């Protein structure tokens, strides 16, 4: 079985509070983009999970999200057959694009079908939560408001199709470290989530671009000023709006046309290796 595992971007990301368990309560609008890993899954006779990948930058053992997803399903539902999973990696790793979470979501969907478990979307989302906060959204895809630690997913009207340029600087960002460094009392600019939802419902690309905002950006930029350099180049080449996604370091810009996006990509190529021009999309859904 071959599945597409789509990346996500955060159009808006607000952090509300820190919980007693150490996690943070957030409100974010997530959006699927037409950038995906390809996941090949096949049954094998021996009771084992084998993960291989085209990338040297991700683990293939029980630290891999796809492996964890397979292990959880097998254990919970007493599946004795094994699986071989191959991940053809196209989504930049550790970028804020949910690369690991979306692979896990694809494996949950695929194994639900292969092993005829007949689990509902809701049941898969509950299992997905145990793997990572972005997994439930990745199961649903499209455009959604996510709350809690990101695991509560409220579907929104689909955003209009937009030209999205993604650039990932070659720096490593720890999500945990970014959240720990965030001082909630010093956040000066928060996203207007309601204005973003209205812009999405109206299909107003310029208003969507105007309302892009991520409160984590100030923390990551403080450590890696290259993020601001990427944003400046996008803006100087007519991006309608630009923002960091997730905890970074990937940045995306919304462009009114592909010509401007390609111009920005040419400028960025001087110091950024991973640059992707794509569009928003619905993803694979359930």
Curated annotation (Swiss-Prot):
EC number: 2.7.1.148
Keywords on record: ATP-binding, Isoprene biosynthesis, Kinase, Nucleotide-binding, Transferase
A GO biological process held by the record: terpenoid biosynthetic process
Active site, renumbered: 8, 134
Substrates-to-products reaction catalysed: 4-CDP-2-C-methyl-D-erythritol + ATP = 4-CDP-2-C-methyl-D-erythritol 2-phosphate + ADP + H(+)
Transferase as UniProt keyword: yes
One Pfam family, short name: GHMP_kinases_N
Biological pathway: Isoprenoid biosynthesis; isopentenyl diphosphate biosynthesis via DXP pathway; isopentenyl diphosphate from 1-deoxy-D-xylulose 5-phosphate: step 3/6
Residue sites binding ATP per the record: 92-102
Key word Transferase present: yes
Gene Ontology molecular functions: 4-(cytidine 5'-diphospho)-2-C-methyl-D-erythritol kinase activity; ATP binding
SUPFAM superfamilies: GHMP Kinase, C-terminal domain, Ribosomal protein S5 domain 2-like
Described purpose of this protein according to its UniProt entry: Catalyzes the phosphorylation of the position 2 hydroxy group of 4-diphosphocytidyl-2C-methyl-D-erythritol.
Family: Belongs to the GHMP kinase family. IspE subfamily.
Protein name stated in the entry: 4-diphosphocytidyl-2-C-methyl-D-erythritol kinase
Gene encoding the protein: ispE
């Amino acid at each position: 079985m071959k599945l597409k595992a789509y990346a996500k971007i955060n159009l808006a990301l607000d952090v509300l509070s820190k919980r007693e368990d150490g996690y943070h309560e957030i409100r974010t609008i997530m959006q699927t983009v037409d950038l995906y890993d390809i996941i090949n899954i096949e049954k094998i006779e021996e009771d084992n999970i084998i993960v291989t990948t085209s990338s040297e930058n991700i683990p293939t053992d029980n630290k891999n999200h796809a492996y964890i997803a397979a292990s959880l399903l097998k254990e919970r539902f007493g599946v004795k057959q094994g699986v071989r999973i191959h991940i053809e990696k196209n989504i930049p790793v550790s970028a804020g694009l949910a690369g690991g979470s979306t692979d896990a979501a694809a494996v949950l969907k695929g194994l639900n079908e292969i092993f005829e478990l007949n689990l509902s979307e809701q049941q898969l989302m509950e299992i997905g939560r145990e793997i990572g906060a972005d997994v439930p959204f990745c199961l649903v895809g499209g455009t959604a408001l996510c709350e809690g630690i990101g695991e509560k997913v409220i579907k929104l009207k689909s955003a209009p199709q937009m030209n999205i340029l993604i650039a990932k600087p070659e720096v490593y960002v720890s999500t945990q470290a970014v959240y720990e460094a965030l001082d909630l009392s010093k956040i000066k600019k928060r996203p207007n989530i309601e204005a973003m939802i209205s812009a999405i419902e109206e299909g107003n690309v310029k208003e969507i671009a105007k309302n892009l905002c991520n409160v984590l950006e100030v923390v990551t930029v403080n450590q890696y000023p290259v993020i601001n350099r990427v944003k400046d180049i996008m803006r100087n080449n007519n991006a309608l709006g630009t923002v960091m996604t997730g905890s970074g370091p990937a940045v995306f810009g919304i462009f009114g046309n592909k010509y401007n996006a390609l111009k920005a990509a040419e400028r960025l190529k001087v110091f950024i290796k991973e640059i992707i021009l794509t569009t928003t999309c619905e993803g694979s859904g359930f």
